UniProtKB/Swiss-Prot annotation:
Single GO molecular function: iron-sulfur cluster binding
Keyword Iron among UniProt keywords: yes
Quaternary structure (record): Heterotetramer of 2 Nubp1 and 2 Nubp2 chains.
UniProt name for this protein: Cytosolic Fe-S cluster assembly factor Nubp1 homolog
HAMAP family, sorted: Mrp_NBP35 (MF_02040), NUBP1 (MF_03038)
Main location group: cytoplasm
Sequence positions that bind ATP: 63-70
Name of the coding gene: Nubp1
Amino acid sequence: MQAPPPEHCPGVESEDAGKGSACSGCPNQGVCSDPNKKLEDPGKALVVESMKDVKHKLLILSGKGGVGKSTVTSLLARYLARSNPDSNFGVLDIDICGPSQPRLMGALGESVHQSGYGWSPVGIEDNVCLMSIGFLLGSVDDAIIWRGPKKNGMIRQFLSEVDWGNLDLLLLDTPPGTSDEHLSVVSYLKDDTNSESLRAVMVTTPQEVSLLDVRKEINFCKKQNIPIVGVIENMSSFRCGHCGNTSEIFPAKTGGAPAMCAEMGIPLLGSLPLDQQISKACDSGEDLTEFKNVTTEALEGICSKIMASFS
């Protein structure tokens, strides 16, 4: 068993692994400095064992912050669960420094419990469960100031020490960019015996500043051989609740997600509106999908395409 990494550990993938000043005196120094040994991560075998009953995994990615990845993740999970009552769904919040799912899913103040099989995720509905570092903090205002190795260790624990049980689909809410969290979760799930079930969905807003980073995320998935189910354009338009007119709050100067999808050969799953009801539901944690509205109409088509991609 490897000892916990020191506070300023450069990480096993770094050129300084086992050689940096922080490595002096670390019991893992010999493992990290040996190019053969450092590739052997005992945590990977634990992840494979823990995830053996999780049929499919779906990464919710963007590259850009503020486009609504977490909101879209919660909406997808709840709509999928409501429209597939005989299936089981899980949500894993791997945005370690900015966990949003406890609030979005109406689970603020909940805590996880240890069982003989590991951490028990928090039940949201009969067929939806959630795990987030937000459940492990003393206060919602606590800041998490961690370097890469500690984040990676936390993600490994979420994948190997949470009792997910039998899930038809696990949705993973990710932070912006292609950082430690992304590399860590992909490295573990691609080593899963059912790695073919790992796919990704991109979330973007219509403006080019968002699309620029989504293109990078698409290329990240291509380099990692992760199939992309498609792209969701969030906040695509706004319909006034008084006059009923529709306007573009974020104009698509370069054609928005449809043009990017055509350019890169990626399916467009659909568009979600900028909806005041979504904003209110995010703050209160209530389930918006139990009501018929413009958002749930859009979710119906998006979710059917996602489920079809795994069949």
